[in-house]
Every structure is written in C-alpha cells, then in structure tokens.
C-alpha cells in the first residue's frame, strides 16, 4: 500500500483567540473521523493553529481506499425459476438491482437450500478524489456558535476565509472550499517575512512558514517557547512568572511569531491590593505578572509581542503607557473605597435586585447571615463570626473597585474588611465565600468561610428552584450546577456532618412566602444528588456503583461519598458479581410477594440445613455490623457481607423459597428480606452489573 502525507490549511482573518485551540483540535478530530469513515488508513493527524490559520496534516495517508468484496444474496433457486426453468420476475428484479443478468449470478448452497448470489469486487476510490469533501465536512462540523458571511459570498465561517491549500504529497488538489478556490498560496506574517509565498509539497508547510513567512504554525511549539522565555525573563528579574494555562493558551493564540519582553510600572501602585493590579494585567492586557520568592508582586510584567524589532524600546514603553491609566484607576478606586466602611454600604444593597421574586441583595445577605450561623453551629465554627461574615458578604459589590473590576469581588471585600478592623476569619471568609470558583479550584480553608460559602450557595439554589426556575438544557443563568457541585465538594472534602434536606429546608424557611414551588426541598436535593453522578463519573467511578447508592438516596454528602467508595471497592471483590446477582434474585422474589413481608425469622420453621446456615449467619451479621453501619464504616461492612457468598449460593441451590407450606414460605421470605436489608444498609447492590 502506498501512502502520502496530506496537508490542508485554511487561511483566515484573525480567529477568536479564546476559541482557536478548540477549533484546531476539533478540526483534527473531525478529519480523523472522516478518514476513518472513508476507510482510508493513516498513521496520525497533526494539527496546527495560529491567529490567521487552521491546518491539519495526515501522515502516511493511503493513496486509495481498499477494494471491497461484496456478496449480495438473491432469492432461493426454487423461487428464482419457474417450472420451465425461466427466471421469475423476482429473480430478474434482483439481478437488475445488482447490474447483472440472472444467468450471470452465482449459486450458494446452504442447509436451507440453494440460493442465487452476486459476488463482485468494488474498487476503492483514489484518496485525492475524496479530500475536498472530507475537509468541507470537517469544517462544517466545527463547534462555531456564531458564523459570519463576508463579501458577496453565501458561505459562512467563524471568520472570512482568504486562502485554502490542499496538498496530497506533491499534488495540489483541485476544487473549492467555503467559496475559495484551492491554490498553493500561503500567507505569511502580517508584518514580518514574506506576505505571500507558495509551496509545492505537503511536507514544506512548517519549514516554509517559519523561514519565509516568519510564522510558527505549531501551536504547542509556540506555547512552549512563550513559557520558557517568560520563565527565563522572570528569573532574570529575581522573580517567578504567574502563568495560568488558559491565559497562556490565549496569548499563544494572539501571536504568530512570539517575542517575549518585560516592562515595569511605578512602585507606588504596589500599595493597591495585588489582586486588583493582576486583574488589570491579566484580564485587560494579557500580561504575565511577576512575583518574588515570598509571593509578593513585583513592579514588572511580561508581555508577548507579535513583532520583533532590533530595538524593542518603543514596544516596551508603549505597553507601559497603556497599562499606567488602568493601574491609576485601580489606585484611585482603592483610595476612594477606603473612605467608607463595608458595613456602611449595607443600605445600598437594598437598591440592587438579586432576583425579582426573591428580593434585593440586602434581603439575600440577611438570609446568608442567618443560614451561615445555623451551619456554623452544626459544624463547630464560630457562630458570631459566620453571621458577621454573612452580613458583610455582598458589601464589596457596592465599591468602586468591584464595580469596575468585577472579578475582584470577594478578594476586595477581604482587603476592605481588614482595613475596617474586622476579625481576620471574617475578612478571609468574604473572599472564600465564592470558593470553589471553578472545577478543581481550592476550597474555603476555615470553617467560618465554609459556613458562609455554603449559606450563599444554598440560598441561591433554594431560591431559584423555589420559584420554578431550575436549569434547563445547557442554560444555567444563576450557575446552579456550579453552586451544587461546589457545595458538595465542601461538605465531602471537609467531611462536614450536614444533611442536604435539612439545609434546604432551613434555607427555604428564610424566604418567608416568596417561594412558590411546594416541592423545593425534594427538587434541590435531587438536583444535587444528580451532580454527584457527574462528579463521580469524572473520577472514573462506574455508573452502576453510583446508581446503587442513589437507589438508597442518602442525603448527607459525606455519608453518600463513603457509600460510593465502599461499593466501588466491593465491586472489585471476587464475590461481588455473585452477590449482586443474588440480591437481584432476592429483589425479584420479594417484589412478587403480596402484602407486608415479615422480618421475624422463626427458627422452629428452619428445615433445610442451607436455610438454617443462612438464617444464622444473617442474624449474626445483623448484631455484629450494627455499630459498623452506625459509624458509617461501609467498606468494612461490605467486606464482611462478602462472606455470605457461599451460604447464599447453597441456599438458592438447595432451598425452594416458594414452598407449598405457607409458613415455610413466609419464613424463607423473611430470611431473604433480612439478607437484602443488610446490604441495603449501604446500597442496592442488585443494581451492579
């Protein structure tokens, strides 16, 4: 089989930087899928992406589809010919559909008789004839939320397309994609190198772009270069660069030929909380801040330019000039905000709606204050501090700094609270109330902060569900999924003795008569348990393990987690499959019993040795494991219950549960009822596959 390397590049105007990597990887995945569907073998598909281009390269792509042998069976010979031996209409119709005559058909003998059959070899198409359609479909299926048209064209794409290049080895593929004729023209850097040049082979692409066009097309290479140079520059200044993955990807998506430089700002700005300065540098300017070895912000920053002059002084001074007004604003807002205490901003919260039916932010803080105190009392936190933090929790939203730099909410509340002389735990809780802010984020450290964070999240969950506005589809305007998962993480990872039903019920009571959903407690709890499913699936825990625990609907998250871990462990035991099957059998037997099933085992009715053995072992385990269940030691309990396997197997092999004698039958059902209840103390293991 002969192969060639295949290149496809789509040259565009500047692509959205936050979407570039996602578009590029999706493009490569789509091409892989299309090649597989076309039955074209290849070694691997590489992807490249820069601000003005998306490209893929399929290495070792077969030059043609493989030939396929087909066998199309027709009617039985007995039905294919009439009494005179002439083909019937059924046979002629089948042959016509195969493109042959009846006498050209082969015959195949089976144990059910002889049949007509058409055998043929379909030659595979040359790969080059399929590539335009493969790329067109791959582009059409990209995750582009908003398309655009350009010029007088009817075609749509994420940005206007100017060039399309498809090479299969040294052959330029002819055709048109997105209304643009395919050619061998590659556009270089907008300001450096050759603006346009041509290539004559798929393998020339990367080298020609770098040497002629001054473009590093490999996204990951560009990213690694920026990271290494940034760390090198920071080290030279005696610091460490703060380089978040998402920002690094975005900066990588903004430049074609990265030039990493450093600049500085006036030291007086360091009097402003570092978070506000960093917000400006990262969010607005896409700069990387630099910290010293003690974690203090230095008056320097790293930026990445898309041009590379011999003397970068003008570029550096330009970036310093751009950032100065933003830092000056932050300084002004900070100094102005310090003139008023956080507590004095409480009345202004009455002017801001949280939600039309649920009242103002002042109403919300009153509810958070009360619920945070309740939670603190349950988990051993300082109730007064939790209530104080709850009261002040939204005051920083009324400050100039947070109004201008919204992502500093919470952290600025902490700084202002410290300035006001609030207790340190209260101040820190104002920042940590929003944790975790995203998947994998750190949790609140103190129990006071946990109390406020949970109170805030449960207030939102209960309130929004309470007015019938649960998330639908992908829409989640109040970020309820994040609030639910964040709450679960706090309770589970901090091992807090909290019950979801209790928390929602207490939260609902604080809304007075504002809630219209009578099932709010059940709805919120079900929603949160559903988030457990997503959490554990992300961890790789089997779905049937989660379903086994969900069947018991434990509403204490820490307890729920302990059950999941125990069942997940139990599932690995040799006896698990047999005991799961036995529990399923028991469940089916008991489901058919009319009326209430007793749990009283009458030892005088134990006839068979096997039922005696099972009854005695079940009774013994009930006594032995009672404290184990009470302490939530579910893995220990299931390990002991695994010892039932042989006894249960023997019981089902030798004992007739539905005996004719009603007393024997009811007693055996009672044995099984007790057996099942032992396992149900942890989960419904009959669900396990």
UniProtKB/Swiss-Prot annotation:
Q: Which GO terms describe its cellular component?
A: cytosol
Q: What is its main location?
A: cytoplasm
Q: Which UniProt keywords apply?
A: Aminoacyl-tRNA synthetase, ATP-binding, Cytoplasm, Ligase, Nucleotide-binding, Protein biosynthesis
List, alphabetically, the HAMAP family matched. Answer: Gly_tRNA_synth_beta
One GO term (biological process): arginyl-tRNA aminoacylation
Subunit composition and interactions: Tetramer of two alpha and two beta subunits.
Question: What family classification does the UniProt entry report for this protein?
Answer: Belongs to the class-II aminoacyl-tRNA synthetase family.
Q: What class of enzyme is it?
A: ligase
| Reactions that this protein is recorded to catalyse | tRNA(Gly) + glycine + ATP = glycyl-tRNA(Gly) + AMP + diphosphate
InterPro entries listed in its UniProt record = DALR_anticod-bd (IPR008909), Gly-tRNA-synth_bsu (IPR015944), Gly-tRNA-synth_heterodimer (IPR006194)
**Gene that produces this protein:** glyS
Q: A single GO molecular function, which one?
A: glycine-tRNA ligase activity
Q: Which PANTHER family match?
A: GLYCINE--TRNA LIGASE, CHLOROPLASTIC_MITOCHONDRIAL 2 (PTHR30075:SF2), GLYCYL-TRNA SYNTHETASE (PTHR30075)
Places the protein is found: Cytoplasm
Q: What is this protein called?
A: Glycine--tRNA ligase beta subunit
What PROSITE patterns does this protein map onto? AA_TRNA_LIGASE_II_GLYAB
Entry EC no(s): 6.1.1.14
Q: Name one Pfam family in it.
A: tRNA_synt_2f
């Amino acid at each position: 089989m002969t192969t060639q390397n295949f290149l496809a590049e789509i040259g565009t105007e500047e692509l959205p930087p936050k979407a570039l990597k996602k578009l590029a990887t999706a493009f490569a995945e789509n091409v892989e899928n299309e090649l597989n569907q076309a039955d074209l073998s290849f070694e691997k598909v590489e992807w490249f992406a820069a601000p003005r281009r998306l490209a893929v390269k399929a290495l070792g792509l077969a030059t043609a589809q493989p030939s396929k042998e087909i066998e199309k069976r027709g009617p039985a010979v007995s039905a294919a010919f009439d009494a005179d031996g002439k083909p019937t209409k059924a046979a002629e119709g089948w042959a016509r559909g195969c493109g042959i005559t009846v006498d050209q058909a082969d015959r195949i003998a089976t144990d059910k008789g002889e049949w007509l059959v058409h055998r043929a070899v379909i030659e595979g198409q040359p790969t080059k004839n399929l590539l335009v359609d493969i790329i067109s479909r791959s582009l059409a299926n990209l995750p582009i939320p908003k398309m655009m048209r350009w010029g007088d064209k009817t075609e749509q794409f994420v940005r206007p397309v100017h060039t399309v290049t498809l090479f299969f080895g040294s052959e330029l593929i002819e055709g048109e994609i997105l209304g643009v004729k395919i050619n061998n023209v590659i556009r270089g850097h907008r300001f450096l190198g050759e603006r346009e040049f041509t290539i004559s082979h798929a393998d020339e692409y990367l080298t020609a772009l770098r040497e002629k066009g001054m473009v590093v097309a490999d996204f990951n290479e560009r990213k690694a270069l920026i990271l290494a140079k940034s760390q090198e520059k920071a080290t030279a200044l005696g610091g460490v660069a703060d380089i978040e993955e998402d920002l690094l990807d975005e900066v990588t998506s903004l430049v074609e030929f990265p030039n990493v430089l450093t600049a500085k700002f006036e030291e007086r700005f360091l009097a402003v909380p570092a978070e506000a300065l960093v917000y400006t540098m990262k969010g607005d300017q896409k700069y990387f801040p630099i910290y010293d070895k003690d974690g203090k912000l230095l008056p320097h920053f790293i930026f990445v330019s898309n041009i590379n002059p011999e003397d970068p002084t003008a570029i550096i001074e330009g970036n310093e000039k751009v950032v100065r007004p933003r830092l000056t604003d932050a300084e002004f807002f900070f100094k102005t905000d310090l003139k008023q205490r956080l507590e004095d901003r409480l009345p202004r919260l009455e002017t801001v709606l949280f939600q039309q039916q649920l009242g103002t932010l002042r109403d919300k803080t009153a509810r958070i204050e009360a619920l945070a105190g309740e939670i603190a009392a349950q988990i051993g936190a300082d109730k007064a501090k939790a209530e104080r933090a709850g009261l002040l929790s939204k005051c920083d939203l009324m400050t100039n700094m947070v109004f201008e730099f919204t992502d500093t909410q919470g952290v600025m509340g902490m700084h202002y609270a410290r300035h006001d002389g609030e207790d340190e735990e209260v101040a820190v809780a104002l920042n940590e109330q929003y944790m975790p802010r995203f998947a994998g984020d750190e949790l609140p450290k103190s129990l006071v902060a946990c109390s406020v964070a949970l109170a805030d999240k449960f207030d939102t969950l209960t309130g929004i569900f309470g007015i019938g506005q649960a998330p639908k589809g992908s829409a989640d305007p109040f970020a309820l999924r994040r609030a639910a998962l964040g709450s679960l993480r706090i309770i589970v990872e901090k091992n807090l003795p909290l019950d979801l039903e209790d928390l929602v019920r207490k939260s609902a009571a604080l809304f007075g008569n504002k809630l219209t959903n009578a099932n709010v407690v059940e709805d919120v709890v079900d929603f949160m348990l559903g988030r457990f499913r997503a959490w554990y699936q992300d961890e790789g825990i089997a779905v049937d393990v989660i379903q086994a625990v969900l069947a018991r609907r434990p509403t204490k998250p820490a307890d729920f987690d302990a059950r999941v871990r125990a069942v997940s462990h139990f599932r690995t035991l040799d006896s698990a499959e047999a005991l799961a099957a036995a529990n399923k059998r028991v469940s089916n037997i008991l489901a058919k019993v009319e009326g209430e099933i007793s749990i009283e085992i009458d030892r005088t009715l134990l006839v068979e040795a096997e039922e005696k053995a099972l009854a005695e072992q079940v009774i013994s385990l009930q006594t032995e494991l009672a404290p184990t269940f009470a302490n939530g030691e579910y893995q220990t309990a299931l390990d002991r219950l695994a010892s039932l396997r042989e006894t249960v197997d023997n019981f089902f092999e030798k004992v007739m549960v539905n005996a004719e004698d009603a007393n024997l039958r009811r007693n055996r059902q009672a044995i099984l009822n007790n057996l099942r209840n032992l396992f149900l103390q942890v989960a419904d293991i009959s669900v396990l596959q």
